Amino acid sequence: MEDSLFSVDKAGPGKDASAASADCNHMVAEDGIITEQHKEIPLVALKVPDGHAPIDECELLNSDDQLPKGSQNQTNICMRIRAFACPPQGCFSLAITNVTMVILIWAVVWSITGPECLPGGNLFGILALLFSAALGGKLISLIKIPSLPPLPPLLGMLLAGFLIRNIPVITDQVQIHHKWSAALRNIALAIILVRAGLGLDPKALRKLKAVCLRLSFGPCVVESCTAAVVSHFIMGFPLTWGFMLGFVLGAVSPAVVVPSMLILQKEGFGVDKGIPTLLMAAGSFDDVLAITGFNTCLGMAFSSGSTLNTIVRGVLEVVVGIAAGLLFGFFLHYFPSKDQENLKGKRSYLILALSVFAVFGSLYFGFPGSGGLCTLVMAFLAGIGWSTDKTVVEDIIAVSWDIFQPLLFGLIGAEISVASLKPETVGLCTATLIIALIIRICISFLMVCFSGFSLKEKIFISLAWMPKATVQAAIGSVALDTARTLENKQFEDYGMDVLTVAFLGILVTAPIGALVIGLTGPKMLEKSESRTVTEEGSV
């Protein structure tokens, strides 16, 4: 029939449609079981109304573009309705699953610990902060600005902790004892130190060009000295505390720099001169120097006695940290042996456990500066011994970091109380931060002079060397935690000022640094002539 939407090709001469159907559905009884014999049926040609050409069924299945516009709209509406069908599908199902998992985590912990997991308890506060910080990081990462690198999720985590602390209704319910928060931050610090130690490439270390060496050490040292002098005169810090603050500020953040550099590298900007690789490689060594300097000053600041005793104490802590790191590193080099099962898992457990033990043990034995050095040296030596196998261990450590990162930045934000901050303190901390940043940018520019870079490239490198985040969050509160352990009120005030500067540094430089890199990179760096750029490994 011409009015029919479908027409069936005849099975053969003299057979009508009913006969073809009978042949197709012919039933045969065999051993009492009825089976159906199928004959090959000619393909069905689909005809559409309004004079449209027939649609091939393969194209109909594989492409929505072949459908008439009205059919596409109906399909989209059906897909949206299906998301709320029973049982739920898609995003609706994902939301229900995630909420259920969060509630179950709390319910399981509550069933074991009781009141500690109710509002006002430590475990309730930790879980609330963890989920809030993770949600804040997710929301920040959803902000997409075309042609710009994404905002670092750590910014949302930091702000989530800050809001929890400074909204009275929430603050009364989310309470975390300072000993619990200090312990969690120290665990996060141990994980960061392990990642930094494993991330050091001995081959790159041997082949470091002069410009990479200068960029790793020059800005960090000069900024630390600048912050020490400025804080000594305008904030009243002792020089040891000033240098401690300086080394907190002196580290650049791989969490901001590396993703931004990878985006530029993928698009071919600065690749011919190796600028993304230079910044990613120098970042690790810059962080190691800052952490080492901080731990040395930490030991000197909390030692009692004369200046000579303080210096000797600082040197002793460095020696003890390096010696313990060498011992643990050689142990991990040979144990577990390569013939054991689950080798990667055992290595990951041992290096994490030893690093946490080193950080907490150094505090217990009165050598607070030794734990960080021990962990760095141990992880570096273990990475050399494991060679290419260390990549799997790094992946496992990264999972631990994914858990503790929201806790770390959330706890740092939760330490800052607007009510307890004095305007003059914020002003002095901001002034110290700005002066140190200006000096760092200038020194970074000088460090890459006479290295074959153009003026625009030098300016870009100096600006890209500005962001602060991960290291500041990890070590910014260590001095405050140590002072609280010793119950020294004067040192607690110094420690809170150090933490405030670290908080402001993250809040200001992390988003601005990411935006500056994304905006200035395409304008100041030369684009590679080759359209295909091979991504080089990140640090």
Curated annotation (Swiss-Prot):
Summary of the function given for this chain in its UniProt record: Electroneutral Na(+) Li(+)/H(+) antiporter that extrudes Na(+) or Li(+) in exchange for external protons across the membrane. Uses the proton gradient/membrane potential to extrude sodium. Contributes to the regulation of intracellular pH and sodium homeostasis. Also able to mediate Na(+)/Li(+) antiporter activity in kidney.
GO molecular function, one term: antiporter activity
Binding site for Na(+): 252, 283, 286-287
Catalytic activity: Li(+)(out) + H(+)(in) = Li(+)(in) + H(+)(out); Li(+)(in) + Na(+)(out) = Li(+)(out) + Na(+)(in); Na(+)(in) + H(+)(out) = Na(+)(out) + H(+)(in)
Encoding gene, per UniProt annotation: slc9b2
Keywords, sorted A to Z: Antiport, Cell membrane, Cytoplasmic vesicle, Endosome, Hydrogen ion transport, Ion transport, Membrane, Metal-binding, Mitochondrion, Sodium, Sodium transport, Synapse, Transmembrane, Transmembrane helix, Transport
Name of the protein: Sodium/hydrogen exchanger 9B2
Positions of transmembrane segments: 95-112, 122-141, 153-169, 180-197, 209-235, 242-250, 279-298, 309-332, 348-365, 370-381, 399-419, 426-448, 470-481, 495-517
Remarks, miscellaneous: The subcellular localization of SLC9B2 remains controversial. Was initially thought to partially localize to mitochondria. However SLC9B2 does not seem to contain a mitochondrial targeting sequence. It was later established that its localizes predominantly in plasma membrane or intracellularly to endosomes and lysosomes. In another recent study, endogenous SLC9B2 in the distal tubular cell line mpkDCT4 is detected in recycling endosomes but absent in plasma membrane.
Protein species of origin: Xenopus tropicalis (Western clawed frog)
